[in-house]
Amino acid sequence: MEVLYSLSKTLKDARDKIVEGTLYSNVSDLIQQFNQMIVTMNGNDFQTGGIGNLPIRNWTFDFGLLGTTLLNLDANYVETARTTIEYFIDFIDNVCMDEMARESQRNGVAPQSEALRKLAGIKFKRINFNNSSEYIENWNLQNRRQRTGFVFHKPNIFPYSASFTLNRSQPMHDNLMGTMWLNAGSEIQVAGFDYSCALNAPANIQQFEHIVQLRRALTTATITLLPDAERFSFPRVINSADGATTWFFNPIILRPNNVEVEFLLNGQIINTYQARFGTIIARNFDTIRLSFQLMRPPNMTPAVNALFPQAQPFQHHATVGLTLRIESAVCESVLADANETLLANVTAVRQEYAIPVGPVFPPGMNWTELITNYSPSREDNLQRVFTVASIRSMLIK
């Protein structure tokens, strides 16, 4: 994997900097590194593809070295270099696609394709290593079964979940109380509602709670907490739990009271915030517990009083909500991230070449299913294919 990254980094630099008119002295170190790559690769044969519709391709390396010049690089020099660069880039692209198409239930973090396994051989250790990539650093650690640490912005840590629970339900669904939520990606939105606006609740207060367990622990997370859940702020028709009927939800938004968010790790509270909104920090957690209250306003103008009558029918439904959004966090496991294209790159290659469903990844690389059942085997394979995708993205956009 380190060789693949070093090849890609060298090729990217060569493509960007070996251009007509450039002073040789400005790129002499790069050209020496480029020539070392050619010397190491010459005389070797590789084969890629042969899975799904990914065609089998054979690769032979027999290229001349780039020479020295006293002045600027001329058109002939650059054209010779370009021919070599384009062949190497095509090779790297196919090695990456071959690797992204494969999976293994055992030691899935190790190279799976024939070409990448060959590149891991001792003879290729002479290629100048560049391990500056976060994915390469963490792949090396994971390969040695040591602690990794990926920095994610908008981590796709929450499997998609959208549902509701009813704490009070009447047969005609005209006097309900409960919670509804939408968890997806890096965001939780939860709303507590009471058609009667806590009319008969103790002290006219309804208590709500929403608990979310993460599939992997996060550390040093920067989080935004808001006293609102905009996705539940407009009327809607909702299917009943048994599917036998539907019920109408017509929210009137109130501000939540006594808001508390707890971040827990292995059942122990690590951080707690009360009535604090905006940016908050969570040190280490695998569970989030949100609790909040709906309080019937003790004093109401006639207009507000008309919204929340003392008896049925309740045409407007008191609602309070919270939004919790993870802006950035560190995770020991690789995840999809809204700010990265790695999952999209891997999925696109597997779809384009009709890669058959294997023993590890779900059909279509369904992220919700993958993260819901995030096994060690999936973690290993995902770390490998995301590392390869990050390498490929240097050369192929």
From Swiss-Prot:
Gene3D superfamilies: 2.60.120.170, Viral capsid alpha domain
Residues reported in the UniProt entry to bind Ca(2+): N266, D286
Subcellular location: Virion
Top-level taxon: Viruses
Disulfide bonds: none
GO-annotated cellular components: viral envelope; viral intermediate capsid
Signal peptide: none
Keyword annotations of the record: Calcium, Capsid protein, Intermediate capsid protein, Metal-binding, Ubl conjugation, Virion, Zinc
Record PTM text: The N-terminus is blocked. Sumoylated with SUMO1 and SUMO2. Sumoylation of viral proteins seems to have a positive role on viral replication.
GO molecular function, one term: metal ion binding
Entry annotated with the keyword RNA-binding: no
A Pfam family it matches: Rota_Capsid_VP6
Gene Ontology terms describing biological process: fusion of virus membrane with host plasma membrane
Subunit note: Homotrimer. Interacts with the inner capsid protein VP2. Interacts with the outer capsid glycoprotein VP7. Interacts with the outer capsid protein VP5*.
Family named by the database record: Belongs to the rotavirus VP6 family.
Protein function: Intermediate capsid protein that self assembles to form an icosahedral capsid with a T=13 symmetry, which consists of 230 trimers of VP6, with channels at each of its five-fold vertices. This capsid constitutes the middle concentric layer of the viral mature particle. The innermost VP2 capsid and the intermediate VP6 capsid remain intact following cell entry to protect the dsRNA from degradation and to prevent unfavorable antiviral responses in the host cell during all the replication cycle of the virus.
Leftover remarks: The VP6 trimer contains a zinc ion located at the center of the molecule. The zinc ion is not essential for either trimerization or transcription activity of the DLP. Zinc-depleted VP6 has an increased sensitivity to proteases.
Name the record gives this protein: Intermediate capsid protein VP6
Organism phylogeny: Viruses, Riboviria, Orthornavirae, Duplornaviricota, Resentoviricetes
